[in-house]
Amino acid sequence: MTNTLWRYGRVLAVLWMAASCSLFAKAETLLWGGHPEFGIELEEEKSPDGTGLTHSITYIPALVFPNGPINRFDLLLMDEREQETTDGVVAKTNITKVALRVRKNIRFGGDWGMYVRALVGHANTPSERYNYGYTDLALRYEHDFFGFIAGVRVQRSLDGTPGHDRNKFRLGPSFDIGEHHELEFRWVRAWDAHTHAREADATILEYTYKF
């Protein structure tokens, strides 16, 4: 995991420097009034029995509309490296995904609120291609630079491809670092939507630059 994070960290540094160029700093005036953001998400997922391990990196260019009917539009570009061990034999698989996601924020007053997100995406593996989607519902607390969410995700295959229906529980803190930077940490537990067997636990680190 350390080597993986090191490689991803170098990618993050290069992209952060590129994002600082004046071309992107002026993008807000060209994007229908939305505020551009760019995120990088690193995830490690492990199966309960230790036979499965997945590392992934996701690039997330986004437009944020604080007062719009939809508050956020994300494009997710994902690259996964999946490793399965069976009887001592290790099989590795590369998975690529592309998805669109929207988010609506709902405020309760004070520091409390919630959000609803919906995603549709397409996944490509050496053995199959499938369409999938999910819906997130999360309770959110925000005070000054600190935030915390706890919520659920319902994920389903959209074309009947088996093996991709999951329910997830997600929680973790976030930290605003100055005006332009945000760090999010998430812990996720996933269950098979049909058998209710626990499938995986994941840890996620996401960095977002706000233009």
Question: Which residues does each predicted region cover?
Answer:
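Repeated loop/turn-to-beta-strand initiation elements of outer-membrane beta-barrel proteins
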Residues: 30-38, 65-75, 107-116, 143-150, ...
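Conserved binding-pocket/active-site segment within a compact domain
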Residues: 136-142, 147-176, 183-186
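Residues that define the transmembrane beta-barrel architecture of outer-membrane proteins
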Residues: 51-59, 92-98, 129-135, 163-169, ...
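Short glycine/proline- and aromatic-enriched beta-strand/turn motifs that initiate or cap beta-hairpins
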Residues: 23-84, 210
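Transmembrane beta-strands of outer-membrane beta-barrel pores
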Residues: 40-48, 77-85, 96, 104-106, ...
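Outer-membrane beta-barrel "beta-signal"
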Residues: 175, 198-211
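Outer-membrane beta-barrel architecture
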Residues: 58-64, 99-104, 136-140, 172-174, ...
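Cleavable N-terminal export/targeting peptides
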Residues: 1-35
